[in-house]
Amino acid sequence: MDERRSKPRLNVSLDAVWHGETGRQSARVTDLSEGGCYLDTVGEVMKGEIVAFRILLPDDDDWLYLEGEVRHHRPGFGFGVQFVDLNEEQTDKLSMLLRLANESGPEPFAISADLVEE
């Protein structure tokens, strides 16, 4: 685990859509914790930028809407965010996702979806 992180991240594979200064982009969340996540995407961001994104939740066609501050990025590969201003509903949904990912064992916990604009 990276020493900069205060919370351990779990290996996941979750479809996501994010919005930043460059517009709407598709992504895949590849690790997730209570404090942040990593998004695999070719879209460009700047360190410190606030991005809004959504992650598909299992079984009920519901989305988890989040905002995060870009903490690091690898141009053309993706970026890591630290969540900002989580409310109780977001925290509950995030906890549910983390519990499911933890129960899935060593294989990445995966949810895929058609990424259409709502």
Please provide the spans of the model-predicted regions:
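Short, mixed charged/polar active-site loops
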Residues: 24-26, 61-65
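A short, polar/proline- and glycine-enriched secondary-structure boundary/capping micro-motif
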Residues: 37, 51, 64, 90-95
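Short, compositionally biased
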Residues: 66-76
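Short strand-loop-strand
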Residues: 12-54, 78-80
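A residue-level detector for short acidic-glycine micro-motifs
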Residues: 18, 31, 70-72, 85
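N-terminal helix initiation/capping motif
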Residues: 1-32, 95, 99-118
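Short, charged beta-turn/beta-strand-edge "cap" motif at the junction between a beta-strand
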Residues: 56-60
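Short solvent-exposed strand/turn elements
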Residues: 6, 12, 43-47, 81-99
